[in-house]
From Swiss-Prot:
Subcellular location: Cell membrane
GO biological processes: phospholipid biosynthetic process
Naturally occurring in which organism (per UniProt): Deinococcus geothermalis (strain DSM 11300 / CIP 105573 / AG-3a)
Ranges annotated as spanning the membrane: 1-21, 52-72, 81-101, 115-135, 153-173
Its job: Catalyzes the transfer of an acyl group from acyl-phosphate (acyl-PO(4)) to glycerol-3-phosphate (G3P) to form lysophosphatidic acid (LPA). This enzyme utilizes acyl-phosphate as fatty acyl donor, but not acyl-CoA or acyl-ACP.
Name of the protein in its database record: Glycerol-3-phosphate acyltransferase
Length: 198
């Protein structure tokens, strides 16, 4: 079982490392790492290539987390290891070997993992995050608020300790990945969704 568990974590990491944004952009003749923010994620694809490619990338990245969790469950892993497979997918997305161990910020893959692990916690976080983005037009603020909502829900609903720890880790990692965005939000120069770059 140790071998199966180790392989599941490794495969989950590799699933997460599939650089959907880079591949979709490359088909359009664009190196996503050299345009916009340089981030290999759906938001940069949206700003650089438009809604269609961005939706495709977002859906793929969400599925990476969900597939990793589903694979672990299909293999009969216990809930904690199943959750860790989701974490591995997020780490693969953020630090992809296909992109020199760089990648995106893990927002879509984190929410895909949370939705698969606990639809109530993940769904609530998703709704709050999207709502914040819709109201403020700040993708970074919505992403962070959504992740923190997941932690709050997991604690308030008395979910198992392993789930609370996993969700808290994902929220902390996501927030860290947005540290530059947080500085820009504090300085008042973070770009809103749909805002053109000067």
């Amino acid at each position: 079982m140790i071998l199966i568990t180790s392989l599941a974590v490794l495969v989950s990491y590799l699933i997460g490392s599939i650089p959907a944004a880079a591949w979709v952009a490359r088909r359009r003749g664009v190196d996503i790492r050299k345009v916009g923010s340089g981030n290999s994620g759906a938001t940069n694809v949206l700003r650089s290539l438009g809604k269609g490619p961005a939706l495709l990338v977002a859906a793929f990245d969400i599925l990476k987390g969900a597939i990793a969790v589903g694979l672990a469950r299909a293999l009969g892993l216990d809930p904690a290891w199943t959750a860790l497979c989701g974490v591995a997918a997020v780490l693969g997305h953020n630090f992809s070997p296909f992109l020199g161990f760089r990648g995106g910020k893990g927002v879509a893959t984190s929410f895909g993992t949370m939705l698969a692990l606990d639809p109530v916690v993940g769904g609530g976080a998703f709704v709050v995050g999207v709502g914040c983005i819709w109201l403020t037009r700040f993708v970074s603020a919505g992403s962070i608020l959504g992740a923190l909502t997941a932690v709050t829900l997991a604690a308030a609903l008395a979910r198992p300790g392993w789930l609370l720890l996993i969700v808290a880790f994902l929220a902390a990692l996501l927030t860290w990945q947005h540290r530059d965005n947080i500085r820009r939000l504090q300085a008042g120069n973070e770009r809103r969704l749909g805002e053109k770059k000067d």
